[in-house]
């Protein structure tokens, strides 16, 4: 369960970084 939550957080951060990078 914790791993899933952590994975979602990581994906969210990556998506935000991609948007900012663009």
Swiss-Prot record:
Subcellular location: Mitochondrion inner membrane; Mitochondrion
The organism's place on the tree of life at top rank: Eukaryota
Keyword annotations from UniProtKB, A to Z: Membrane, Mitochondrion, Mitochondrion inner membrane
GO-annotated cellular components: mitochondrial inner membrane
Location (main, coarse): mitochondrion
Family to which this protein belongs: Belongs to the MICOS complex subunit Mic60 family.
Annotated function: Component of the MICOS complex, a large protein complex of the mitochondrial inner membrane that plays crucial roles in the maintenance of crista junctions, inner membrane architecture, and formation of contact sites to the outer membrane. Plays an important role in the maintenance of the MICOS complex stability and the mitochondrial cristae morphology.
Subunit record text: Component of the mitochondrial contact site and cristae organizing system (MICOS) complex, composed of at least MICOS10/MIC10, CHCHD3/MIC19, CHCHD6/MIC25, APOOL/MIC27, IMMT/MIC60, APOO/MIC23/MIC26 and MICOS13/MIC13. This complex was also known under the names MINOS or MitOS complex. The MICOS complex associates with mitochondrial outer membrane proteins SAMM50, MTX1 and MTX2 (together described as components of the mitochondrial outer membrane sorting assembly machinery (SAM) complex) and DNAJC11, mitochondrial inner membrane protein TMEM11 and with HSPA9.
Protein name: MICOS complex subunit MIC60
Organism in which the protein naturally occurs: Mesocricetus auratus (Golden hamster)
Gene that encodes the chain: IMMT
């Amino acid at each position: 369960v914790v791993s899933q939550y952590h994975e979602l957080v990581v994906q969210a951060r990556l998506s935000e970084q991609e948007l900012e990078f663009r």
